[in-house]
Design a protein with these regions (language model features):
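A short SAM/SAH-binding and catalytic strip from SAM-dependent methyltransferases
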Residues: 115-128
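A short glycine-rich, Lys/Arg-flanked "PGG" loop and its adjoining helix->strand segment in the class I
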Residues: 129-141
Length: 230
């Protein structure tokens, strides 16, 4: 769904590539571990150290790649379409390969990976089916696809993905609302079966870092899904 009917903040909005190009410098200072790493750490159906060959779609600055290496992932590639984000990922040295490409059309060989991962990027897609189809194409038989996303609850409450420029001006990055059922439909049509799901809510750790979020206490802010190839 188009986000604009729900937009309460009316920040200037940037296209995705332009937005992340500008945000690259401060991205890791803004995105909290409670948004994504907390949920990844709670996943029970993936043995990261035994995951085989892994692809981090929309890898950004390499935050997730660094976490994956710390969990024992041995073979890891990172892919992103924003050069400025990818340069920071490459500088971390956590990926065997860094690939500049669109995650919906990677150009990578089919059945190349045992596990495909996409974290905090799906809200920028106008439609989900291409993501799930490309992940299915890249995954080997019985492969796994892990998705961690910004919860639609927050988008429906008018809060887009956004950051502050150097001068303090807040700007948003183009976002779309995908219900959790939209993920289920797109995944099933692409041949995936849900193995696990979790949701992260705003709790004390969040509020300690963002006191103004007290008003959102116990609201769902992110989600994780683990899919398996049928």
């Amino acid at each position: 769904m188009d986000f604009s009917p729900f937009d309460r903040r009316r920040y200037p909005t940037l296209p995705v590539r332009e937005g992340y190009r500008e945000w690259a410098e401060t991205y890791e200072d803004v995105v909290q571990d409670e948004m994504d790493l907390r949920l990844l750490a709670r996943i029970e159906t993936v043995d990261w150290a035994q995951a085989g060959r892994v692809l981090d779609l929309a890898c950004g600055t390499g935050r997730i790649g660094a976490w994956l290496r710390a969990q024992g992932v041995q073979r890891l590639d990172g892919l992103d379409f924003t050069a400025e984000m990818l340069a920071r990922a490459e500088a971390k040295g956590v990926y065997d390969r860094v690939i500049r490409a669109d995650m919906l059309d990677t150009g990578l060989p089919a059945a190349s990976y045992d596990l495909v991962l996409e974290v905090l990027a799906d809200e920028h897609l106008s439609a989900l089916p291409p993501l799930y189809r490309e992940a299915a194409r890249l995954a080997r038989p019985a492969g796994t696809f892990v998705v961690v996303g910004y919860h639609p609850h927050f988008l429906l409450n008018g809060i887009p993905t956004h950051f502050d420029r150097r001068d303090g001006e807040p700007v948003a990055i183009e976002s779309y609302v995908h219900l959790l059922s939209d993920h289920a439909k797109a995944a099933h049509r692409a041949g995936w079966t849900l193995a696990e799901m979790d949701e992260g809510v705003v709790e004390d750790a969040w509020i300690a870092k963002k006191p103004k979020w007290e008003r959102y206490r116990f609201h769902p802010v992110s989600f994780a899904m683990v899919w398996r190839r049928r």
